[in-house]
Amino acid sequence: MIERGKYQSLTMVNWNGFFARTFDIDGLVTTLSGGNGAGKSTTMAAFITALIPDQSLLHFRNTTEAGSSQASRDKGLYGKLQPGACYAALDVVNSRNQRLLFAVKLQQVAGRDKKVDIKPFVIQGLPSHVKPTDVLIESVSATQARVRQINEVKESVAQYEGVQFKSFSSIVDYHAQMFEFGVIPKKLRNSSDRSKFYRLIEASLYGGISSAITRSLRDYLLPQNGGVKKAFQDMESALRENRMTLEAIKTTQADRDLFKHLITESTNYVAADYMRHANERHKKLEQSLSLRSELFSSRETLIEQNRLLNQVQQELEMLVESESALEQDYQGASDHLQLVQNALRQQEKIERYQEDLEELNERLEEQSMVVEEAQERVLMAEEQSTVAENEVDSLKTQLADYQQALDVQQTRALQYQQAVQALEKAKVLLSDSTLTAESAQALVAQLTQSEAEQTQALLALKHKLDMSSAAAQQFENALKLVHSIAGQVERAEASRYAKAAIQQARSAQQVVQNENQWRAQHRDLERSLNQQNQAQALVAEYQKAHQVTLDDEVMFEQERERHHAQLDSLEIALEENRELRSEQRRQEQDLQSDITQLQAIAPKWIAANDALEKLREQSGAELADSQSVMSQMQQVLEQEKQLSQAKDKLAERRSQLESEIERLASPGGSNDPRLKGLADTLGGVLLSEIYDDITIDDAPYFSAMYGPARHAIVVSDLSGIEEKLVELDDCPEDLYIIEGDVDAFDDSSIKAEELEGAVCVRLNDRQMRYSRFPVIPLFGRAAREQRLELLRSEREEVVEKHAKAAFDAQKMQRLFQAFNQFVAEHIQVAFAADPEQALVIARDKRNQLTRTLAELEAKEQQMRSQIQNSKQALTMLDKLAPMMAVISDDTIGERFAELEEKIAQLADAKQFLNAHAKAVEQLESQLAVLDADPEQFDALEAQYQSADSQLQALKKQIFALSDLVERRHYFAYADSVDLLSKSSELSEQLKAKLVEAERTRSRYRDELKQQQEQMNQYNQVLASLKSSYQAKLETVQEFKQELAEFGVSADEGALERAIRRRDELHERLHTSRSRKSEYERTLTSTELGMKELAKRLKKVQKEYVELRTFVVAAKAGWCSVLRLARENDVERRLHKRELAYLSAGELRSMSDKSLGALRLAVANNDDLRDALRLSEDNARPERKVLFYIAVYQHLRERIRQDIIHTDDPVEAIEEMEVELARLTEELTMRENRLAISSESVASIIKKTIQREQNRIRMLNQGLSNISFGQVKGVRLNVKVRESHEVLLNGLATQQEQHKDLFETARYTFSEAMAKLFQRVNPHIDMGQRSPQVLGEELLDYRNYLELSIEVNRGSDGWLQAESGALSTGEAIGTGQSILLMVVQSWEEESRRLRSKDIVPCRLLFLDEAARLDAKSISTLFELCDRLDMQLLIAAPENISPEKGTTYKLVRKVFKDHEHVHVVGLRGFGQEQKPKSEAQQMIEEFEA
């Protein structure tokens, strides 16, 4: 690692108080400690004077004068010196371990100004053991010494081998030497640099934040950059070249823009209107066809609806008439039903009352029987009670009279015997041995009934016999009854006829009894017959509707199955039709989507096709597919590359020629423009200028003789040239300098020998140079002019070839660009199928699908109608289903006729009964009279005798049985027989019997009483029943009378017939009303539809007539427009197919926009302006075509035939584009130089700014952790001024926007920069500065930056570093940090100027360090240690010498002589740094 150079010591000779004092400078901090006036400031002044020996800058003052503008006249230096020679010397060891003694000799100059003469010098290579005082002071004796003069010093130094002494006549040279050896951080080229350095040292010395430095931080921290000036020169040259090209481009652009603008706008203006008329004509034709189709269809629909309306009206009239009759019938049926229902209710009442009567009659009979039984029981009870009473009385009598009792018992025994006899007699008469007394009573009843029958028969015979014998009149009456019934009959037949009449009456009764059954059958058959008639009507209606006759149930089932199958098939077909329609609609939507897509693609395809055709014309290739386009594009690219390479070679050759011409045209013909400046700097003349007048024949010789030195600089004296050459910053690698008289140059010093075609030059005894004559000599003006003439001729030829090659290359490049643009924009669609043909096909398919959809809808409507018919048929069949059983039954009529006959018989029977019922009833009672014919009396008498004998025998039996029954009580007297034999026991038995008899009597009395009470109750019930029966009977008679008044038949059949008729009429009426409502709705809707249709028909007819008139009228105008366009060959330019897909509004908008642009474009051309004004008449579209033709004719006249070889303005635009591209390319090449120059200006400034920002950021890192009092850090902020940043952006990226500044001859580049700055920052006042001055300032990047210093102080954070905001110690520490940053910046800036193995010394000062506290001083020590810096401070006596080296200064006065006593002390807290290997080797060598 390279070590930093260090100050080793400061030697002061003959200063006030210091005759010969050397202060060793510590590697860290050197402290000068002492009281006031001890000499601390003097010591520092000596150091600074040796460092900056410029009296115009040196001004040593104390801190009280820090802000004073006026100070002592000697500026603090004169008074610090003793008379005579004085020295201040700095002993330095640099990074190369070279010992250097930089010193200044100072001597007071007598006079009022108190000036000091300063002469700097340097001693290099002084041995380490030799002290500076050894060469500056000469010892006269052991106690006396003398200050040597500078010459003596030089002589003294000369005694040391290798030691060099060098004095300097200028401070610049002195500082250049110091910079070269790494003593100062910056190269001080002039007084400004020295002033900056001195200000830094002064600020360091007095401490604090120097306003002089902080205000000029940019000058201190930011180095200059000469690259901008170079960029400025490049830009100025590029601007000059640009202006000529720009004028040519502007001319071509003006023509191109005029052609392009007029063609584009006129084409848009006329073509938009042209295509709008074409589209409108096409649309009007389609619209007229559509209106005509609609008109015809509307007429047919109107006729159909009118026919339907008339039919509906007729049916409605018929329906209204039938509905009125139906309403009357329905009302009558409702009234009849009401009567039948009332009659039925009355009949129900009668029947209910009759039932009650029958029930009352039954109850009455039952009650009568109950009463009779009760009477019998009462009689029996009375009889038993009487018997019991008699028995008791008898027993009492018998007990009272025993003989009587005995007689009674005898009587009873006799009665018992008679009863037994009677039983035996009865058994004999009846021949029944099982007969008993108990069974005799039942048998008596049977025989009594037989007796009654036989008695009746006997009485009848007796009656007949009596009648026959005594009542002939009765026979006549009965015969009359027979005659009234059967008419005149024979007397013998009267009985037969009477019986027949009675039989007929009985038959009639039976017929009447069958009335209900027959009526029910009649109702059923009538219902069946009605069903049959209704079914036949439905069959007829079905046959009328479906042309099918339903003969039987088989046919019915077949028809039902057919309709079900038809329904299923229709449903399936309807679903298929619906799916098919959905599919057709989907296809229609797809087609519509395809049409929309094709319409969207069509303009792109048309544009692509046009571009493809244009490419085919330009390239001459077929370009059948994309592959051929790509291959042709590759061929064009290769051709363009070949042409571009040829053009580039020509351009390169042109550049070479121009460079050579420029070089040859320069003074001396030097190929390096820097030589002229160097010649001026060195005070010489170019050798080529001296030989400028030689002849062309001598030019080869002299050119070969001087060889590489032909561009040498001739100077009058070589002394001092080396020093000047060292100061050169920029010079050629080889620079030849020849000493000679410029006015009378002599080449005799060159030992040259001319050979054949060459020159041999002997440089010295060991070197020689052989140079052949150049083929093209350039030495001398004559040779250069000859060469220039040839080069210029060649350049013209090359320029012409380059222009042609550039034109061809540009044309090929435009062709490649056209290919490239085609590939980028159109290749995807160019080779696709023609969308217009696809559109025609798609539209045809869509129309076909529309027709198919209409057919499908009609078919669906038809199927729905068939489905409806089938459903109606099935409904009719469902109605017919229950009736089909009767429709084929032919017997219903016969049975109904038979029942009608029976009903008629019933009527006859009722009529017979009504007529002869009473007669038959009388006749039936007198029928026997007719049988008893007087002629038959004997037979009747014999029959009577026989019947009487039988009756008598029966009576005997009954008598015997009755006697037995009467004597049945006597069987209880069986014991009386025994009592007769036991008379003794008779009394006791009688008493017992009496008791039993009394008990029996009591029981019989109770029973009698109960039976009498019960009979009374039964009699009461019987009386109430008779009363109820009578009342019910009267009510029934009244109800029958009321029922007779109704005049209707009150039976279930009548009600059912009435309800059925009422319901049938109601259904028919409801159906009629529904049909009427439907007809009325149909009528209303049809009338409304006809009105709307008629209105629409009128409107359509009117529109059609108007549209047809318009179409016919427009056709003639369109034909004239079309003929005019074809005759003038503009149809292909006006008929833009892509415009056909735009709406009329879009086309009109396009035309209007173009019209506005054309008005401005042709404002200065009377002919075109008049033509445009005439073309604005929309009623005359041909005038727009005439305007387009006029524009074309005008443009043909404007074509520049010198550069364009066509009469077509469109092709002329293409050629102008090529020419413009060629000129633009030239401009671009120059603009690239301009852009590169301008961009380089901005780039250099930006990069420099960025580099400096990074460098300052690195500097900040070293100061971020320092601490002085409350200050915890120091940093430097750098930012670009906003106004200048806008300028940089405008300069770098907005060149096109600011061309008017940089491409005009009115402004230089600096002025253009100033104008640009004013343009982008209009708010900034420029003051009195001229644009040139401002522009030069803007070329300095440092003016773009703003620098500020901030400190991190306490709770305030980062704030601006100002002395007023900081304490004294904080300000001093901050100031030292800032100065250290400046020093570091200078070192970085000057690194490229010095040797890489040199690291400069770094030292600062600080006077009156007592203003810092111990912590701040410690921070300074640490800062010096960290940054490898040396610090020289003057401190009071209270500074502790812990680190560094401390010198104790005490000024002592001895008589008239002052002396500063110095005691040196190295800090005890300082660590000894390890010595480097070089230092150890030097110490060992010196030892």
UniProtKB/Swiss-Prot annotation:
Keyword annotations from UniProtKB, A to Z: ATP-binding, Cell cycle, Cell division, Chromosome partition, Coiled coil, Cytoplasm, DNA condensation, DNA-binding, Nucleotide-binding
InterPro entries: MukB (IPR012090), MukB/SMC (IPR050308), MukB_hinge (IPR032520), MukB_hinge_sf (IPR042501), MukB_N_dom (IPR007406), P-loop_NTPase (IPR027417)
Localization, UniProt: Cytoplasm, Nucleoid
Residues involved in ATP binding: 34-41
Example of a GO cellular component annotation carried by this entry: nucleoid
Annotated region (Flexible hinge), positions in chain: 667-784
Stretches of the chain forming a coiled coil according to its record: 297-426, 460-666, 781-806, 836-1111, 1210-1266
A single GO molecular function term of this UniProt record: DNA binding
Family, similarity comment: Belongs to the SMC family. MukB subfamily.
Alphabetized HAMAP family for the sequence: MukB (MF_01800)
Role, per record: Plays a central role in chromosome condensation, segregation and cell cycle progression. Functions as a homodimer, which is essential for chromosome partition. Involved in negative DNA supercoiling in vivo, and by this means organize and compact chromosomes. May achieve or facilitate chromosome segregation by condensation DNA from both sides of a centrally located replisome during cell division.
NCBIfam families: PRK04863.1
Protein name from the UniProt record: Chromosome partition protein MukB
Organism listed in the record: Vibrio vulnificus (strain YJ016)
